[in-house]
């Protein structure tokens, strides 16, 4: 039986969105759509991240108010370099329609600021569809 997959561009801005003390706010929220998704299937979020270089836990990620994983840090990395990361999620987390993605700022354990500022860009959701 063939498997069908679709992709949703959640956010695709060249410079990315800034999250943290210097950002818009410490939680970035955006709506994306996964019409026809297979609830028993698999999905993953893919994004590029830059500047998340401090110590401590990464940035918390939620879809539809459910924790799905963390954006991992790259301690000591060059803050000018972009890194690709993915978070695997269950198709059951996604709605057959509008979904809410939340990315929380990561705590800064080694500086004066409350958060470790970072940028996200090229955010995609790949998901299985009902054939």
Label for each model-derived stretch:
Residues 1-131:
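Beta-strand-rich recognition domains
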């Amino acid at each position: 039986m063939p498997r069908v997959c679709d992709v949703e561009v959640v956010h695709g801005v060249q410079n990315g969105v800034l999250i943290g003390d210097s950002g818009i706010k410490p939680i970035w929220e955006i709506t994306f759509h996964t019409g026809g998704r297979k609830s028993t299937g698999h999905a993953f979020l893919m994004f590029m991240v830059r500047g998340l270089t401090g110590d401590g836990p990464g940035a918390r990620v939620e879809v539809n108010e459910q924790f799905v994983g963390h954006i991992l840090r790259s301690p000591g990395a060059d803050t000018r370099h972009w890194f690709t990361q993915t978070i695997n999620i269950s198709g059951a987390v996604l709605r057959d329609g509008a979904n809410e993605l939340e990315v929380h700022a990561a705590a800064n354990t080694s500086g004066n600021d409350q958060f470790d500022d970072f940028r996200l860009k090229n955010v995609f959701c790949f998901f299985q569809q009902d054939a």
